[in-house]
Amino acid sequence: MLKRFFITGTDTSVGKTVVSRALLQALASQGKTVAGYKPVAKGSKETPEGLRNKDALVLQSVSTIELPYEAVNPIALSEEESSVAHSCPINYTLISNGLANLTEKVDHVVVEGTGGWRSLMNDLRPLSEWVVQEQLPVLMVVGIQEGCINHALLTAQAIANDGLPLIGWVANRINPGLAHYAEIIDVLGKKLPAPLIGELPYLPRAEQRELGQYIRLAMLRSVLAVDRVTV
């Protein structure tokens, strides 16, 4: 059984957090213990408790065990620190240890990335290098919009070039007015080398909703049932 997997997106703001929420809720509905993990979060806000990131808070809220914020998001970067122009080291040992600790506590850990597959951290390294180091299977979120077929195929190819398995993809309808939605899904289904795990419709305030119903549970169980996935 795959205990942990990584969520990437075809771009920034394509819905990685709401898809992560949907996956966590779907797995929890099957009696699984789950935890969300956001190793590096940009654009965090100062609060009385310290820096907090809204995406990480969503993941914390749908984890099935009580976790301190730092266990969900060990590295929170402020808005000023979030630009790649602001150079600072990233403690990869810290985020690896955090992932290992969560993996011991739950059935599944959903690890949400930052930006797209090649988005750079403040040390000018893509987080994907850490994903390769951890040998995490990858699930891709495709924001359904103009140009998404190109972005999805390029992202899938980059993941394969890095030697990691793409175990599935989820379509997120971020543009409700987009024509030819069904045709886009059909083309992606034919061209991507992994199964469609779910389709999220356009929903206002999706990060506050029950989203597990939009995940194809049988397909999700199938891709997670193996001990190890190869490319």
Curated annotation (Swiss-Prot):
Homodimer. Disulfide bonds: none annotated. The keyword Mitochondrion does not apply. This is ATP-dependent dethiobiotin synthetase BioD 2. It comes from Escherichia coli (strain K12). The keyword Glycoprotein does not apply. The active site is at K38. GO terms for biological process: biotin biosynthetic process. Its main location: cytoplasm. Its cofactor is Mg(2+). Catalyzes a mechanistically unusual reaction, the ATP-dependent insertion of CO2 between the N7 and N8 nitrogen atoms of 7,8-diaminopelargonic acid (DAPA, also called 7,8-diammoniononanoate) to form a ureido ring. Mg(2+) binds at T17, D55, E112. The gene is bioD2. One of its GO terms (cellular component) is cytosol. It comes from the Bacteria. GO terms for molecular function: ATP binding; dethiobiotin synthase activity; magnesium ion binding; protein homodimerization activity. Gene3D superfamilies: P-loop containing nucleotide triphosphate hydrolases (3.40.50.300).
